Each structure stands twice: as C-alpha cells, then as structure tokens.
C-alpha cells in the first residue's frame, strides 16, 4: 500500500488496514470506497505456473482441445480499479482518490471434476493500492 511491501501475509495486511482506519484519538472509523471505473486486460494468455499436467496444452496438433482449456482459463488478468475513498462513516467525510491494481491468476483447484464449494475461480497474485 502506497509503496509499502507486505511480506507477512494476510495478518500483516489486516493489521495495516486496521491502522489506516484509526483516527488520531484511536477510534476506528469506517472506510468507504466509491468505484468510478475499472479496466481489465489479459496479462498472459498462457499462464502455467503450478498448472496441473492435465490442463497443459497438448503437444499433439491433431489432439482434440480440452473444453476447460479452450475457454482461456489459463490466462492471467491485470485489473485496475479507480475511485474515491473516504475515511469516516458519513458522506461528508473528506475524500481522496485511490488506484488499485490486481494481478489475477486462475485457481487451479476449481478446474477439476468436482471443485470445492464456494471456491473462487481467480486468486490475487499481486495487489498494488495507492491512495492519492
């Protein structure tokens, strides 16, 4: 967030977000995001990091394409979200711009015959949040 590298995982991220919500007097406030726009592009159409063998593209050019691979499930995506952020519960709270960039990659656990219930199809590989 704003250039800080978080290597400690989800717990470090939660601690940082909680600290952002604190007022100088120590009261935790609500944070309100108003998305004004977003844009998504394919970053890598053939993302294969940790891809199971059965989903890799067959080397035989005459082989019938697998239903799961022809839908570009192997692509990684770049998602950019912009908008306004306000710290405080009411609509009168001061606002500032934000920009959030995500790299989304396929969740290979969802590309099996019986995937886990409520599993997400995409996972966040990288996130870069900037409050401007």
Question: What is each residue range found by the language model?
Answer:
Residues 1-75:
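A solvent-exposed, acidic/Ser-Thr-rich amphipathic alpha-helical stretch
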Residues 40-41, 48-132:
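Short beta-strand edge/turn micro-motifs at domain boundaries
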